[in-house]
């Protein structure tokens, strides 16, 4: 039952988190361009990992698990020399504020938003940080004062907590990072180019062969 509830919640908050705070939103792209963060890859890794501080590509790759160092290293740590992690965190919240004002202009000051923030903050009490470094870093941020931005922050926390639960499950199954990526592609039916995260062909093919051996 708990799994069913978690999945039902995910289906509700995932579209909201991505529509308002995803790296592809026009607001996020504009603000990241103003900061000088360059391409989509840099803006993605910088905005999502900024709460961790000035970490290197190896740390981001390890925490994101199935994102190879080769994929992360063109963006991190270069991003921190362009804008500080603290500025990037603030910029992401600014982009979320603008996006929600565009998407929900009549609702952002409603009583329902304020009530939802209270519920999400209560939900955080049941989300342990142990073994979830990215969630812990985001959870350590100060909650935004604007209720609609605070709601997005809380929903994003739920998303990151769930995501690192997936990482724990993959590790418990003894799936190395390079096998986790093709496993995801196999289950979603997506093309490899959309989800390869720049694993070199030799390592990718070795991972696929390893998955076949596990059957």
Model-derived segments and spans:
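Phosphate/adenylate-binding glycine loop and adjacent helical scaffold
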Residues: 1-214
